[in-house]
Amino acid sequence: MSARPVVTVEFYGVPRQRAGRAELEVAARTIGELLEAVEHACPGLAGLRRPDGRLTAHYLLSVEGRQFVSDVRQEVRPGDRVLLLSADAGG
């Protein structure tokens, strides 16, 4: 079994306020593991995931700022930066 890669999660908007920090390093192989680690490390973000493990509609995830992701099975690589944003409607 290989070690989990270290991934940096950057928080923006409401997630930053709820996390109480700008970023967090987590060990995760998939987006699902990453979300679980974020909820564990940042109690203010409890409820980030739906009962089926997917991200709630209140948040968006972007890997390396290039693509938005929703598949919790998607793998992450060592050194990836994953952005967690509010999915607020703008005006």
Regions picked out by a protein language model, each given a short descriptive name:
Residues 1-90:
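Ubiquitin-like/PB1-type beta-grasp interaction modules and other compact soluble beta-rich domains
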